[in-house]
């Protein structure tokens, strides 16, 4: 932060600081208060950017207040709390910001006040000029420091890249040119999500809603493209005709109740027929149709019915794309040519709508058409296609055709790193192995794979620094050898270890089901000993609030999944024990198999070492910290532990021995405050 702020001030420029997790973003925001201690200067110089779904939508709030007579009591109280918060909030961040979600009386109500469904009507909204999201976007153009996440940073870079290829100007803002990527080991994952193509039912429903607006009995607020532009194009009959063509074409996309219709084998429209054929091929090639987890299969060899429906769906998309492209060109001409008073009233709305049109007409729909074109063939070089039926707790919730790049950092390097004037990528776990071994070329190769640096014309500069912590003195690593995968034994192990540590324990799981089962089993025993237990996917709080509660109560315990393995900073007494349920192997799905084929047989080990190292990294945050890292998996091979700090002996112990070691180590002199309660 210090070098970034100094450079920004001296050069009157902007530096984007990008993270992967909300937890680290919050920590950086707190640290920036030390860089800019004056609150007024901080507000002027720094912008925190998050996704749309984080900010309170003022129009949603207005509509909820209109429903006061029919709200239940706790929802009425919740709305009053939000109203009080609105008068004091800095940025309107309802999810993980300054809103006290821990005190919220109606879990699940607050997220409904954000725009998670893409219902924003932009310039047509009466609150547009006061909109928290728009205000943050405008402010980021003049800030010295912009704190974002990897996904938003890539969105911004892609938007400017697309604008360079059209007549657009990127909304009048200069593109980001200087970056600091913290949590750089997650660039690969962020790019994998951002540069993927998902032709799924949920995506199709959203595209239809964006064009036609809410339909059926959903009662959702929002206006589609047709309603937003009808008044603007009132004196342009040819453009109104194009708008009508687009609306008619959107009938080929899934509508409300599409999953039920597919289950009943009664699809409507080209895309629903395509999705039903996808579902049929996946089910025909799956061995366990009753699995609670998602099903997937290769596209090739393709079933004739799927191929025929893919061709029909592609033609339907062409019928949407062609008039959409023509409409976008005409709207941009109108923005350049018309300055009359009547059109000036609509200018802001047209600019907002045009951004949405170009995003879909230039990126989304052409990408879908490209993937459908190749459905009977192998995916183009460097990519992998597959069909999937996504499930949650045994119920289908999405179906689609998916295309991912085997190495998504190629696009990241092209769109983000190459145009940049400077990019600094940092992480304590960028390299694969422990420090002495990872000074070799192989160690840095893993870093280049995760960050895309290997795709740059000029090689990236490398720098590594020795940790300031004495891990051999401050920590212990234990592999428990006699805990099976039986749910009761696993729960008993967590219970005994948490009690031995006297709280201050973080339990990490590879599945939500196992987490919930363990929570049910150990909560009574911990409660009897005065050890509060919090858990993701159980407590109705966002991850940031759970971590805050865990941090403040030194004897509490917390259960979580991946989000708590990365980017959580809990120094001091509040975290002295980390327990992994099992070795966090990557899931051997179709995409992972393709990557393992390209990156080599050691790819699985690289990912697993990274995850273990990240979990261990939560434990020691200060020179005065002490803690124990426990892995409840007797089959953990020693090679996977090579990424953990050197000098710390890996002890393979029985559960009883591990419990005794945890208790003894945490009671050693120098950590008296961490001693478990008697």
Regions found by a protein language model. Give the residues of each.
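A substrate-engagement module of RecA-like helicase motors
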Residues: 12-15, 19-144, 209, 216-284
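Conserved RecA-like ASCE P-loop NTPase motor core of nucleic-acid helicases/translocases
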Residues: 14-21, 425-426, 504-515, 631-632
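Non-catalytic, alpha-helical, charged scaffold/linker segments
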Residues: 66, 200-371
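A contiguous, basic/glycine-rich beta-loop/short-helix subdomain that forms a polymer-engagement track
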Residues: 110-141, 154-167, 320, 327, ...
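SF2 helicase catalytic motif II
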Residues: 173-195, 199
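Conserved RecA-like P-loop NTPase helicase motor core
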Residues: 471, 480-485, 538-637
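Conserved interdomain hinge at the start of the Helicase C-terminal
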Residues: 478-510
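Conserved helicase motor "Helicase C" RecA-like lobe of SF1/SF2 P-loop NTPases
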Residues: 510-537
């Amino acid at each position: 932060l210090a070098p970034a702020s100094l450079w920004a001030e001296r050069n009157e420029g902007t530096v984007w600081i990008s993270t992967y997790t909300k937890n680290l973003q919050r920590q950086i925001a707190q640290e920036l208060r030390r860089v800019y201690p004056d609150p007024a200067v901080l507000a002027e110089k720094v912008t925190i950017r998050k996704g749309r779904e984080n900010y309170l939508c003022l129009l949603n709030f207005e509509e909820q207040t209109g429903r006061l007579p029919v709200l239940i009591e706790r929802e009425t109280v919740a709305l009053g709390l939000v109203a009080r918060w609105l008068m004091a909030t800095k940025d309107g961040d309802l999810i993980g910001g300054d809103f006290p979600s821990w005190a919220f009386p109606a879990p699940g109500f607050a997220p409904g006040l954000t725009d998670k469904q893409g219902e924003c009507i932009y310039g047509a909204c009466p609150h547009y000029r006061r909109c928290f999201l728009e205000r943050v976007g405008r402010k980021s153009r003049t800030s010295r420091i912009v704190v974002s996440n990897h996904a938003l940073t890539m969105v911004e870079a892609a938007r400017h890249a697309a604008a360079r290829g059209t007549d657009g100007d990127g909304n009048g803002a200069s593109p980001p040119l200087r970056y600091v990527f913290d949590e750089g080991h997650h660039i690969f994952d962020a790019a994998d999500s951002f540069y993927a193509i998902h032709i799924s039912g949920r995506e199709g429903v959203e595209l239809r809603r964006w064009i036609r607006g809410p339909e059926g009995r959903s009662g959702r607020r929002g206006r589609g493209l047709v309603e937003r532009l009808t008044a603007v194009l009132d004196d342009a009959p040819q453009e109104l005709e194009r708008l009508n063509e687009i609306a008619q074409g959107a009938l080929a996309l899934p509508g409300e109740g599409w999953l039920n219709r597919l289950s009943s084998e009664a699809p409507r429209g080209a895309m629903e027929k395509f999705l039903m054929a996808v579902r049929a091929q996946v089910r025909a090639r799956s061995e366990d149709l009753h699995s609670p987890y998602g099903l997937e299969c290769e596209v090739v060899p393709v079933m004739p019915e799927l191929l025929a429906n893919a061709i029909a769906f592609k033609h339907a998309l062409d019928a949407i794309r062609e008039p959409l492209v023509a409409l976008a060109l005409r709207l941009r001409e109108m923005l350049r040519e018309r300055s009359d008073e009547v059109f000036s009233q609509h200018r802001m709305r047209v600019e907002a709508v045009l951004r949405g049109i170009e995003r879909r007409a230039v990126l989304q729909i052409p990408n879908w058409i490209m993937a459908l074109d190749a459905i009977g063939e192998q995916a183009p070089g460097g990519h992998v296609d597959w069909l999937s039926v996504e499930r949650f707790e045994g119920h289908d919730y999405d179906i689609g055709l998916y295309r991912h790049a085997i190495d998504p950092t190629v696009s990241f390097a092209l769109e983000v790193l190459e145009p940049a004037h400077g990019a600094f990528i940092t992480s304590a776990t960028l390299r694969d192995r422990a420090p002495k071994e990872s000074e070799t070329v192989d160690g840095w190769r893993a870093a280049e794979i995760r960050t895309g640096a290997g795709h740059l014309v000029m090689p990236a500069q490398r720098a590594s620094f020795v940790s300031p912590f004495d891990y051999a003195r401050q920590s212990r690593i234990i592999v428990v050898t006699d805990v099976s995968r039986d749910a009761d034994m696993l729960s008993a192990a967590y219970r005994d270890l948490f009690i031995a540590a006297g709280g201050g324990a973080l339990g990490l799981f590879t599945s939500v089901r196992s987490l919930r089962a363990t929570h049910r089993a150990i909560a009574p025993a911990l409660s009897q000993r005065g050890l509060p237990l919090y858990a993701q996917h159980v407590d109705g709080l966002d991850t940031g609030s759970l971590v805050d509660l865990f941090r403040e109560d030194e004897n509490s315990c917390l259960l979580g999944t991946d989000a708590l393995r990365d980017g959580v900073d809990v120094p001091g007494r509040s975290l002295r024990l980390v327990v992994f349920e099992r070795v966090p192997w990557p899931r051997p799905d179709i995409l992972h198999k393709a990557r393992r084929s390209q990156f080599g047989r050691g790819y699985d080990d690289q990912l697993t070492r990274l995850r273990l190292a990240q979990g261990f990294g939560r434990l020691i945050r200060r020179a005065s910290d002490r803690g124990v890292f426990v892995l409840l998996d007797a089959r953990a091979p020693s090679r996977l532990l090579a990424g953990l700090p050197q000098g710390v002996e890996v002890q393979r112990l029985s559960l009883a021995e591990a419990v005794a070691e945890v208790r003894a180590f945490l009671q050693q002199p120098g950590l008296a405050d961490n001693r478990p309660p008697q």
